[in-house]
């Protein structure tokens, strides 16, 4: 009788979800306990005995197998939105849309940066030389020029007067022994001895020994004072010759020549082609003018101004166009080209392979067949 209230109490204290399992367990226990109190036997053999006393609770049985899964519950509330996933790959390019209408013209842009300056145009042809201007006032006397170079050696002068007698020189060194001298004189006759018996004639006596050589005389040196006087006389003559030659050169060069250092520029005032001018200067023992400095170029400018004619110079670019050289083939060490020159713009006259100098000292390339003033360099 106590089993029923006990079972109810256990059921009330268990959670609802384990109610089915407990009922099954309880049912199994009740049957076991009933069999323990009353000897059970098959119904065929007779009635069961009366109930005995309640036995003690047996040991806990093993855990039964899990039950069948329950029915699926209702869907829960939707969770919160998760974070934004990574960007997907670009889709394929769609077909181009239809061309839109032309929009209105935009405002004009700011002006661009000015472009670089263009190349300088070719220089115009050289104009003709204008008429000579009126002579200017006489200039001031220039500074004294440099002493000219030593002139050529003159012819031998007349023999000068004999110099003064020099002083006696110091004694000379002792000379080497001289050769054997001549035989010495015979000795003095001795006193006559007593007359002896006349013997046979004796043999000829030997040659006597050479006598001693006399001392060598002293030799005098040339007079130093006289030599110095001769040198001073020659120096004075050279200075007088240089001065006379310098004056002669100035007279000879004026007005158609100029001297610069060791060079002399000379003109006859006539005009020739370049080739003819070369021949004229070569036959005269010189060459065409080749200015190698500003000073030499200025001297040529003075000659050209005096003649009022442009003159040919010796340089050409016949071998290599644009590369002017001296007659020796050397490149130029000095040049004074006019602006835009050389330009080889010969026009109908042909290539400009020669050089001319104007009265202002500027150079211009010119056709070699033209006529220009001839200036030779010596």
UniProtKB/Swiss-Prot annotation:
Compartments reported by the entry: Secreted, Extracellular space, Extracellular matrix; Secreted, Extracellular space, Surface film
Cross-referenced Gene3D superfamilies: Mannose-Binding Protein A, subunit A, SFTPD helical domain
Signal sequence, start to end: 1-20
Record's compositionally biased regions (Pro residues): 105-114
Main localization category: secreted
Superkingdom: Eukaryota
Post-translational modification: Hydroxylation on proline residues within the sequence motif, GXPG, is most likely to be 4-hydroxy as this fits the requirement for 4-hydroxylation in vertebrates.
Keywords linked to the UniProt accession: Calcium, Coiled coil, Collagen, Disulfide bond, Extracellular matrix, Gaseous exchange, Glycoprotein, Hydroxylation, Immunity, Innate immunity, Lectin, Repeat, S-nitrosylation, Secreted, Signal, Surface film
Subunit structure: Oligomeric complex of 4 set of homotrimers.
Function as written in the Swiss-Prot or TrEMBL entry: Contributes to the lung's defense against inhaled microorganisms, organic antigens and toxins. Interacts with compounds such as bacterial lipopolysaccharides, oligosaccharides and fatty acids and modulates leukocyte action in immune response. May participate in the extracellular reorganization or turnover of pulmonary surfactant. Binds strongly maltose residues and to a lesser extent other alpha-glucosyl moieties.
PANTHER family reported for this sequence: PULMONARY SURFACTANT-ASSOCIATED PROTEIN A, PULMONARY SURFACTANT-ASSOCIATED PROTEIN D
Misc. remarks from the entry: Pulmonary surfactant consists of 90% lipid and 10% protein. There are 4 surfactant-associated proteins: 2 collagenous, carbohydrate-binding glycoproteins (SP-A and SP-D) and 2 small hydrophobic proteins (SP-B and SP-C).
Protein name in UniProt: Pulmonary surfactant-associated protein D
Species this protein is from: Sus scrofa (Pig)
């Amino acid at each position: 009788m106590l089993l029923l209230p006990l079972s109810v109490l256990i059921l009330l204290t268990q959670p609802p979800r384990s109610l089915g399992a407990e009922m099954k367990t309880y049912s199994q226990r009740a049957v076991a306990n009933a069999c323990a109190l009353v000897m059970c036997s098959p119904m065929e053999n007779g009635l069961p005995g009366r109930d005995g006393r309640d036995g003690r609770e047996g040991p806990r049985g093993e855990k039964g197998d899990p039950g069948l899964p329950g029915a699926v519950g209702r869907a829960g509330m939707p969770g919160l939105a998760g974070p934004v996933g990574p960007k997907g790959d670009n889709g394929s390019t769609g077909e181009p849309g239809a061309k839109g209408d032309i929009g209105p013209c935009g405002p004009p842009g700011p002006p661009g940066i000015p472009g670089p300056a263009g190349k300088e145009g070719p220089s115009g042809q050289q104009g003709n030389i204008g008429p000579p201007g009126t002579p200017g006032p006489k200039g001031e006397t220039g500074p004294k020029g440099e002493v000219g170079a030593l002139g050529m050696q003159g012819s031998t002068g007349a023999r000068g007067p004999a110099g003064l007698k020099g002083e006696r020189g110091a004694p000379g060194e002792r000379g080497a022994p001289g050769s054997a001298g001549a035989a010495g004189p015979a000795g003095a006759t001795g006193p006559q001895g007593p007359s002896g018996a006349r013997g046979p004639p004796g043999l000829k006596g030997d040659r006597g020994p050479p006598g001693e050589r006399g001392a060598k005389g002293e030799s005098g040196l040339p007079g130093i004072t006289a030599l110095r006087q001769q040198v001073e006389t020659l120096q004075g003559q050279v200075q007088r010759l240089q001065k006379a030659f310098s004056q002669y050169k100035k007279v000879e060069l004026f007005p158609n020549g100029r001297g610069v250092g060791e060079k002399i520029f000379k003109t006859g005032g006539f005009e020739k082609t370049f080739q003819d001018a070369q021949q004229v200067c070569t036959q005269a023992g010189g060459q065409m003018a080749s200015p190698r400095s500003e000073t030499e170029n200025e001297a040529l400018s003075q000659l050209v101004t005096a003649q009022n004619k442009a003159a040919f110079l010796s340089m050409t670019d016949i071998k290599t166009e644009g590369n002017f050289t001296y007659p020796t083939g050397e490149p130029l060490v000095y040049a004074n080209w006019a602006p835009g020159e050389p330009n080889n713009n010969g026009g109908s006259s042909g290539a400009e392979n020669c050089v001319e100098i104007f009265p202002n000292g500027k150079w211009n390339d010119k056709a070699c067949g033209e006529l220009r003033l001839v200036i030779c360099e010596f």
